[in-house]
Amino acid sequence: QGRPLGPPIPP
């Protein structure tokens, strides 16, 4: 998909 894998970035 277009989104890279990895932990989500906190706001």
Swiss-Prot record:
Keywords: Hypotensive agent, Metalloenzyme inhibitor, Metalloprotease inhibitor, Protease inhibitor, Pyrrolidone carboxylic acid, Secreted, Toxin. GO terms for cellular component: extracellular region. It is found in: Secreted. It comes from the Eukaryota. One of its GO terms (biological process) is regulation of blood pressure. The modification Pyrrolidone carboxylic acid is found at Q1. GO terms for molecular function: peptidase inhibitor activity; toxin activity. Expressed by the venom gland. This peptide both inhibits the activity of the angiotensin-converting enzyme (ACE) and enhances the action of bradykinin by inhibiting the peptidases that inactivate it. It acts as an indirect hypotensive agent. Belongs to the bradykinin-potentiating peptide family. This is Bradykinin-potentiating peptide TmF. It comes from Protobothrops mucrosquamatus.
